[in-house]
């Protein structure tokens, strides 16, 4: 039909590592329970955006993020030598993610030829928190956190439904997350990039800081080798926002006998800058 030319197909971001990770089970005798990730959304956007295809796409991406993180967290736990159980674990991993989406300066414009559309700016901020808890002594826990945000606000220009029926060139609004109205490809790419950056950042933080099951009770060297199958993925690197301004990984430890961790002072400073709560998006 005539409307198809208004749309561009943009596939969903691929969270899968290019090389599947092979896990050789290690019989450490240490078990872990993985709780489902708790997602908390905090949105501040216009009613127009509520019905836009980008909003539908972001919701779908959040589902994919959760599903893929849960799969890879399981892989990392197995790589570290834990046996995954659902009852009576030695340790528990609790993960929560908060996603803040903000639309600024939304302005509606009407045009006889092209219908009604909204111009605005969008920002997204992710914060992840993973607690590694000793099930036999819940005072004994390690807290890992990761955060990522869009480098800058993304300029949007999206069509909205016109109620008065006068317009002879009505724009069809897509409700399919991979079928975007023309002009939304670049914003979608920037949004996808931030999801992928947060995904990788969170997994690397966990991989670098989760103690090996065989090392529990010993001093753990802090290696920064990274989660191999992700580090080897060159396409990931190209699409990552700048690491310095954007991401920080921090480790906070409640006093524990058997899981020493070494938070570096730079991480601590980074974190306080990001959590001053004044302005999330510059």
What are these regions (language model features)?
Residues 24-26, 85, 118:
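A generic structural signal for short, solvent-exposed coil/turn residues
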Residues 45-48, 82, 91, 100, ...:
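Sequence-level detector for tyrosine residue identity
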Residues 52-59, 114-121, 135-205:
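Short secondary-structure boundary motifs at beta->alpha junctions and helix caps
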Residues 73, 77, 95-104, 145-168, ...:
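Short flexible/disordered coil segments
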Residues 74-88:
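A short, well-structured beta->alpha microelement
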């Amino acid at each position: 039909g005539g409307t198809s030319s208004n749309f561009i197909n943009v596939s969903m971001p691929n969270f899968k590592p290019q090389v599947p990770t092979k896990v050789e089970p290690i019989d450490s005798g240490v078990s872990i329970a993985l709780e489902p990730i708790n997602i908390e959304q905090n949105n501040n956007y216009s009613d127009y955006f509520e019905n836009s295809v980008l909003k539908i796409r972001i919701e779908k991406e959040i589902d994919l993020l959760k599903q893929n993180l849960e799969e890879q967290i399981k892989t990392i736990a197995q790589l570290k030598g834990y046996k995954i159980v659902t009852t009576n674990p030695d340790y528990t991993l609790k993960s929560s993610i908060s996603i803040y989406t903000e639309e600024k300066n939304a302005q509606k414009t009407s045009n006889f030829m092209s219908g009604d559309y909204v111009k605005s700016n969008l920002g997204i901020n992710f914060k992840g928190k993973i607690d590694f808890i000793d099930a036999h002594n819940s005072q004994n826990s390690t807290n890992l956190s990761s955060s990522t945000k869009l480098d800058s606000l993304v300029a949007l220009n999206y069509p909205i439904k016109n109620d008065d029926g006068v317009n002879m060139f009505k724009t069809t609004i897509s409700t399919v997350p991979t079928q975007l109205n023309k002009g939304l490809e670049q914003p979608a790419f920037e949004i996808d990039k931030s999801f992928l950056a947060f995904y990788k950042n969170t997994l690397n933080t966990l991989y670098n800081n989760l103690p090996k099951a065989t090392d529990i009770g010993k001093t753990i060297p802090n290696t920064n080798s990274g989660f191999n199958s992700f580090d080897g993925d060159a396409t990931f690197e190209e699409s990552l926002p700048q690491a310095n301004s954007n991401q920080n990984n921090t480790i906070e430890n409640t006093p524990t006998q058997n899981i020493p961790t070494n938070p570096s002072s730079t991480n601590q400073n980074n974190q306080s800058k990001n959590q001053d709560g004044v302005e999330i998006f510059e």
